[in-house]
Regions:
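A glycine/threonine-rich phosphate-anchoring loop and its flanking beta-alpha core
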Residues: 16, 114-207
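C-terminal charged capping/lid subdomain of soluble metabolic enzymes
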Residues: 2, 184-186, 286-368
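Residue-level signal for inorganic ion chemistry
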Residues: 18, 40, 78, 129, ...
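Solvent-exposed alpha-helices and their adjacent loops that cap or buttress functional pockets
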Residues: 7, 32-33, 93-95, 118-120, ...
Length: 368
């Protein structure tokens, strides 16, 4: 077992990473939190695979549990689905000592976290992530959100979980696209914080792709959580240092929005976004050709998915300008000067973004 503490001024909490720990979820909740009433929010896929394991674990510890199930996919991160969940929660007569368990990937974690943070002015939330992306990134840090037609994560809250419970073994049922999506975030941590971890991950991609040695997988997931916990602990509300976690997300969110939130997984779009923002760093003279080529070679080993056919340069810029990170019309990107060491958030102009997009298009042709 690995334990990572997220140290915040008012809402510190543990992340527990342990292989084959899903069946002990109820025991951990009883010992650490002591809640007796709760509701599990999950999706159809996760419920079919692991729902009974979680249900048994919770009920064996005397918890009264209800379950709300949504359709899998980014489409569930919507006002309509959130509204339905509010109505269903109200019918359950929950009280403020009840707990919401977000049991699923990033979509479920964001959606359940948002609904839990706003229903009855805020219920305690426990994150039980089941995808690589959710385990290493979205379940930690307290950001919750739903999407609007005009952009991703435009409605959301900061609501730290009571605890994050991670069982890396459940990753064995992920699709290759979901693994690749999560690996985008894993590699991001290496590039912004720990270059040695980046190259170690590149050298052992099969550990994630084949869900290999549980101890090694546990250690890698733990390292990601340690990095995010340190960053969030120093900047909980995303006003400074935490912005480096958005590496690849400015361009990536534009690509994801342009694909209609479905053609590409979030992490896949972020991989493309990281390459685009690395190209801007290269174009500004921050990275040498050698360093850029080495990192590019590593990222393209992930068998990148196709970019949306109908996403033009103009439409990409339109989506990027709608992004919630824009301030006073200024677009910022995370630019890498020295991997793992020297990272800055800097203003980026439309001309540079167009150049990055043209590079991505040319790279797609050369790759495929």
């Amino acid at each position: 077992m690995n334990l990572v503490e997220v140290g915040l001024e008012e809402a510190s909490y543990p992340i527990i990473i342990e292989a084959s720990s899903l069946s002990s979820t109820g025991e951990v909740i009883r010992k650490r939190i002591g809640r007796k009433r709760g509701v599990v929010i999950t999706d159809e896929t996760v419920d079919e695979l692991y729902g009974s394991d979680l249900d048994d674990s919770l009920r064996n510890e005397g918890m009264k549990i209800d379950k709300l199930v949504v359709e899998p996919g980014e489409g569930s991160k919507s006002l309509d689905v959130a509204g339905r969940l509010y109505q269903e929660l109200a019918e359950l007569n929950l009280h403020r000592d009840s707990v919401v368990l977000a049991f699923g990937g990033g979509v479920v974690g964001d959606l359940a976290g948002f609904v839990g943070s706003t229903f009855l002015r805020g219920l305690p939330v426990i994150q039980v992530p089941t995808t690589l992306l959710a385990q290493v990134d979205s379940s930690v840090g307290g950001k919750t959100a739903i999407n609007l037609a005009r952009g991703k994560n435009l409605v959301g809250t900061f609501h730290q979980p009571e605890i994050v419970l991670i069982d890396p073994v459940v990753l064995e049922t992920l699709s290759s696209a979901d693994v690749r999506s999560g690996l985008g975030e894993v590699l991001k941590y290496g590039l912004i914080w720990d270059e040695n971890f980046f190259w170690k991950t590149v050298e052992s991609l099969e550990l994630f792709e084949e869900v290999g040695d549980p101890e090694e997988l546990e250690a890698s997931v733990s390292r990601c959580c340690e990095i995010k916990a340190e960053v969030v602990g120093r900047d909980e509300l995303d006003k400074g240092l935490r912005q480096i976690l958005n590496f690849g997300h400015t361009i990536g969110h534009g690509i994801e929005a342009g694909s209609g939130y479905g053609e590409l997984k979030h992490g896949e779009a972020v991989i493309w976004g990281m390459i685009g923002e690395l190209w801007i760093s290269l174009n500004r003279g921050y990275l040498t050709d050698e360093t850029f080529d080495q990192i590019l070679g590593a990222l393209t080993r992930l068998s990148l998915p196709a970019l949306p056919d109908d996403l033009t340069n103009a439409r990409l810029l339109e989506y990027i300008h709608r992004d919630k990170k824009v301030r006073d019309g200024v677009i910022n990107c995370v630019l890498i000067k020295e991997p793992g060491e020297d990272i800055d958030v800097e203003r980026v102009g439309d001309t540079e973004l167009k150049g990055a997009w043209e590079f991505l298009r040319s790279l797609e042709v050369s790759q495929g």
